[in-house]
């Protein structure tokens, strides 16, 4: 009895949109059309949009230029010897002179003494090459044996 009354109340209180099986889709579409147009009323869609966009682009370019200038000034400090390098490279008077430097050149004689890594690499290459040749030879041998067995 209680169940019948709950079902009857459900049918009586159910509207076409809330809980009923007949849903009017066209009515819902008409309600949702043009509801959110106010959120698009900004300066980006008005006459002033060109001025705003130009100002934004100008600020962005200025910021990028400032960053580039700061990076160059930080890198071109005294420790990099930028002016000294420019003089050595671009002055004609320094072509005959040798430039003095406190850095020692790379000495190749020390490299010749370390021959052990080269020996190890050559042994490894020899073993790898031998393994490849052995596996190719073994593969051909097994193919030939299987071909002979199938012919018999």
UniProtKB/Swiss-Prot annotation:
Residue ranges that the UniProt entry lists as topological domain Cytoplasmic: 1-114
Keywords noted in UniProt: Cell membrane, Membrane, Transmembrane, Transmembrane helix, Virulence
Residue spans, topological domain Extracellular: 136-152
Leader sequence segment: none
Entry GO terms, CC: plasma membrane
Cellular localization per UniProt: Cell membrane
Bilayer topology: Single-pass type I membrane protein
Phenotype seen when the gene is deleted: Mutations abolish synthesis and secretion of both EsxA and EsxB, without affecting their transcription.
Membrane-spanning parts: 115-135
Domain of life: Bacteria
Tagged with keyword Transmembrane helix: yes
Function: Component of the ESAT-6 secretion system (Ess). Required for the secretion of EsxA and EsxB.
NCBIfam families, alphabetized: T7SS_EssA_Firm
Family from the record: Belongs to the EssA family.
Protein name: ESAT-6 secretion machinery protein EssA
Lineage: Bacteria, Bacillati, Bacillota, Bacilli, Bacillales
Protein encoded by which gene: essA
